[in-house]
Amino acid sequence: MDCWAFASVCDKVLHNEKDGPLSAAAERNFARLGVRNIRCTRHVVSPDSDDWLKDLRHFAPDWIFADPARRDSAGRKVFLLEDCSPDILKLLPSLWEISDNILLKLSPMADIPMLVSRLGDRLESVEVVSLAGEVKELLCVLRKSHSGEPALKVAELSDTRPFSLDFTKSEEDATPPVYASEIKAGDILLEPSSALLKAGCFNILCARYGLRKLSRFTHLYSAAEDPGIPGAFKAFRVEKTYPFGNAGFKAAGADYPKAEVTARNVPLSSDQLRARLKTAAGGAAHIWACTACGEKMLIACSSI
């Protein structure tokens, strides 16, 4: 699919797949789709072989796209760059001799600070790509001309709730958080998307959208009004708060016999919270157990 998409915007594409049957299947599919500007090769790409390098040099690409295998020889998932196959870090010196631009597609589980450290100053951006709230890929854009800190980009690709945000780690670190002093009925409670959390976007959300963070390690936010960015946040309206403890569990469970529940930054799992509340799953209500405004509490909300 990647090469098929590239072929729609590029003059020509070189597709390499070391697995013979998979390569043959791709070649047949390209032909059936009427794609004529893709050439398929079947090289084993490694620092110890050079057939693939000769082909790549002859092709002279403007961009090199690499999607290394994310499983080891035993079929286990791997997340470190050096554990993927091929090891991109060992190939980079050769790749830079051939092209000025490299795009890597990596596991959504890969650690972004690790990628920034391993890939060095030529890393222009790390892009967290999500669809319908689920992080699908990490894309790393490397350019020979780039030097310095990479941009961190979030992109939600949903047709109905697209969203994008760009920032840098230094901007995040330099932005002071704004903390909520109270949580009351009528407030809007906001849960950031998994893509924002993956990118490490926390304090900037306060500055850019006028939000208040519930506490340092509770990645929930409050606002007087819904910012109206469904691709970035799930929004809830606060109905009532309860103390975190037996009395609060009993009262919240009685008021909300059916609700979704989530524990965040408290010494309970979500399953344990449900057991303490004696609340059945389902319904329009959502009960959060979290640390907020310097104390642990229960926050009962309705979805917006």
Language-model features and meaning:
Residues 1-304:
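SAM-dependent transferase fold signal centered on methyltransferase-like domains
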